[in-house]
Amino acid sequence: MTRNENVEENLSVRVRDLNLWYGDHQALKDISIDIFANTVTALIGPSGCGKSTFLRCLNRMNDLINSVSIKGLVEMDGHDVNARGMDEVALRRRVGMVFQKPNPFPKSIYENVAYAPRMHDMVSRKADQDELVERALRDAGLWNEVKDKLHEPGTSLSGGQQQRLCIARAIAVRPDVILMDEPTSALDPISTATIEDLMDKLKKDFTIVTVTHNMQQAARVADYTAFFHLGEMIEYNATKQMFSNPHTKKAEDYITGRYG
């Protein structure tokens, strides 16, 4: 690692010795990683290696699965997100999520963005709400395409537009971290390029952690990359270093397509 690793204020998320089980099956094994603020971190690895499971540990989405048990530290601002008494709703406001397939609410474009800030009492006046919706849609690169049809259903948009609407929905509450679980896997190449450009812009204000199976995408968008294999994090480094000179044979084989 090359980035001021000992400077705590650069950290957004600190993970130490994280283990997770689905019943008797251990899905994550002793994961330790520092995720830096205002960067894009890509999680790569074969299907079933633990990438998405790890991602969901960062906002406790795994808590929704009855058979899950977790040990280890996931820390934000010095607070363990798994600590007893942690407000999960408040945590998920700070750690937004964008899923693999666009999933807009069955509401208008406007309401898709306005709903969460209103539920969190972030706005009271209609004018403030309008301003917040416009800001989120602008930040998601969608405003000019929807400003004249804000009260049409979010589901009326194209797939790529729906995914940007979901990003606008996530950033409307101004989270610290945005989790993206293969956010472009269901999109066409043009929409994919738009989302990738957006990720580069959004990292100025947010920390982004993304799961991807696309090595080229990881190389294009990520500042740091972590390679997972069979529940273990095999290697974590600056993306340029990882892709030009990986330190492990497993990472090299996966990145170069020789895996398996």
From Swiss-Prot:
Name of the gene: pstB1
Keywords: ATP-binding, Cell inner membrane, Cell membrane, Membrane, Nucleotide-binding, Phosphate transport, Translocase, Transport
A single MF term (Gene Ontology): ATP hydrolysis activity
Top-level enzyme category: translocase
Binding site for ATP: 45-52
Name under which the protein is recorded: Phosphate import ATP-binding protein PstB 1
Location relative to the cell: Cell inner membrane
Subunit structure: The complex is composed of two ATP-binding proteins (PstB), two transmembrane proteins (PstC and PstA) and a solute-binding protein (PstS).
EC number assigned by the record: 7.3.2.1
CDD domains: ABC_PstB_phosphate_transporter
Matches recorded under SMART domains: AAA (SM00382)
